[in-house]
Amino acid sequence: MRLGIKEIQEIIPHRHPFLLIDFIDELEPGVRAVGYKSITFNEPQFNGHFPGQPVMPGVLMIEALAQVGAVAILSLPENKGKTAFFGSINNAKFKQMVLPGDRLKLECEIIKRKGPIGVGKAVATNAEGKIAVSAELTLSLIHI
């Protein structure tokens, strides 16, 4: 199932400039999602990270992965209207710099769910298939 920006915004509350997914290419509600993010020089973080040598901040790559995980878990009918918040970020590993012009494939598989908590195994790869970042993300689902 493919989701564009409009469908993504119906599931998660993030908006510009903090919506870090361009589209979802694969979705199994409650199980996994695969999304993509094209990195462009015009993004606001590159004004200061780093002037003359722009590099995508690792925390924003983690956030993009969490947004994909949130789409996966919040796409379940019983989670409609909830928001996913970080519970924890474990075993984060940053392996490749991500630069303007790169395209990230963002994958998150929900490996455990218990009540309002979901744990996702998340990996972002570049166009060459090299892992840029991986982490285990715990998301807490809350009505706000």
Write out the residue ranges for each language-model feature.
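Beta-strand-rich interaction surfaces with strong enrichment in secreted/lumenal proteins
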Residues: Q9, G52, F94-Q96
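Active-site helix/loop of acyl-thioester processing domains in fatty-acid/polyketide metabolism
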Residues: I24, M56-N79
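Catalytic strand-loop segment that frames the active site of acyl-thioester-processing enzymes
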Residues: H16-M56
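Hydrophobic beta-sheet segments that form the core/acyl-binding groove
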Residues: I24, N90-A127
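Conserved small/polar residues in nucleotide/adenosyl-binding loops
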Residues: I142-I144
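Short aromatic-glycine motifs in intrinsically disordered, low-complexity regions
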Residues: I5-R15
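Hydrophobic beta-strand-centered segment that forms part of the acyl-chain substrate-binding groove
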Residues: M1-R2, G69-K105, A132, E136
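Short beta-strand edge segments in extracellular beta-sheet folds
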Residues: T138-S140
